[in-house]
């Protein structure tokens, strides 16, 4: 693992959907389809940011801003680059862009058993505001609860 906190982040486009879906499949047990990612990236109010190297994407975040609220739809980091700071870097970049697009608060759902993600969101200043019972399906097929987290966004100067 290489420290990648300062890796440049670029806007993701629908043409990136194939490689982002492949990364999502490496990062999650229930990956998103290429078409779902492409459709989101083509949508209005959607934020898509990615970090990459010569081999392809290392991480990405999809978010959207609607009526003053921003939501992280997914954030994925290649397993070989986890705990490198990349997730926090992508989250900060998406938060900044969401604030510039009028977002006053940022929301997300996270599995109660995803300790790495919970640590990331805690360090980023998110607080628990709700619980969605059975929101996810675990690897064993059983329902897994999701925490709903919120963080106020600082308005850009």
Regions found by a protein language model. Give the residues of each.
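Short amphipathic helical patch at the helix-1/turn junction of helix-turn-helix
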Residues: 77, 111-112
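Acetyl-CoA-dependent GNAT
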Residues: 2-7, 11-84, 88-101, 134, ...
């Amino acid at each position: 693992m290489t420290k990648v906190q300062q890796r440049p982040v670029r806007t993701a486009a629908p043409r990136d959907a194939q490689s982002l879906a492949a990364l999502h499949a490496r990062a999650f047990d229930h990956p998103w389809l290429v078409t779902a990612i492409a459709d989101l990236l083509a949508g209005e109010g959607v934020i898509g940011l990615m970090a990459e190297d010569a081999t392809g994407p290392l991480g990405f975040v999809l978010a959207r801003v609607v009526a003053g609220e921003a939501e992280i739809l997914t954030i994925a980091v290649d397993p070989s680059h986890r705990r490198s700071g990349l997730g926090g870097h992508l989250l900060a970049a998406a938060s900044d862009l969401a604030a510039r697009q009028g977002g006053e608060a940022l929301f997300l759902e996270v599995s109660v058993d995803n300790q790495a993600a919970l640590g990331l969101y805690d360090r980023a200043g998110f607080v628990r505001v709700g619980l969605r019972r059975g929101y996810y399906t675990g690897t064993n097929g059983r329902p897994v609860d999701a925490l709903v987290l919120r963080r106020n966004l600082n308005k850009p100067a």
